[in-house]
């Protein structure tokens, strides 16, 4: 699996940075794996992040915007990518008092997915919605209760609209736009 990952990572890096030299490619790949390992290791401390014991390790920019969303009781669609520890975003939104549901794609590893679901529901965001038709009913129900939604938009999708991404046609999710239009 790691060999396959390396091929995909190198191909993607060369698509994004066609002039990258081998040294920079290897360095960037090492940094990527380093970040991936840190995020994985931070799950051990996710309870401490939730309980406020590690707040000095987190920097929030734009808290005043979140405070305004809460004050106005607005429903918002939060979009992000898998940057640093992406789980902390949903955790902070929920801890701030925003009624939040998070859309997720189940992990390929069924056993690990069950563990991650429990961790996410207990410490990150109580309302976890599985991506796809199965979670749609739950999402609609929560949206009608004025819940905001958090989702990562940097994953491969099987449906959407075709758009140019690094000069290649790629399916692009329309979920954020659909949520804003409908709710």
Tell where the protein language model's regions lie, with residue ranges:
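Negatively charged linear elements and acidic catalytic determinants
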Residues: 7-56
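Soluble catalytic domains of membrane acyltransferases
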Residues: 47-183
């Amino acid at each position: 699996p790691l060999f396959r990952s390396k091929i995909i990572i190198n191909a993607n890096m060369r698509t994004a940075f066609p002039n990258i030299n081998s040294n920079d490619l290897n360095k960037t790949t090492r940094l990527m794996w380093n970040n991936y390992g840190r995020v994985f290791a931070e799950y051990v401390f996710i309870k401490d992040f939730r309980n406020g014991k590690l707040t000095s390790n987190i920097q929030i920019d734009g808290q005043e915007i979140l405070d305004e969303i809460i004050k106005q009781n607005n429903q918002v669609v939060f979009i992000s990518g898998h940057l640093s520890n992406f789980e902390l975003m949903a955790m902070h939104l929920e801890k701030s008092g925003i009624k939040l549901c998070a859309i997720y794609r189940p992990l390929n590893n069924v056993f690990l997915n069950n563990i991650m679901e429990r961790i996410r529901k207990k410490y990150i965001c109580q309302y976890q919605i599985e991506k796809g038709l199965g979670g749609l009913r739950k999402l609609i129900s929560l949206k009608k209760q004025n819940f905001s939604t958090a989702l990562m938009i940097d994953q491969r999708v099987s449906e959407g609209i075709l758009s140019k991404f690094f000069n290649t046609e790629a399916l692009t999710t329309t979920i954020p736009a659909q949520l804003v239009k409908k709710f």
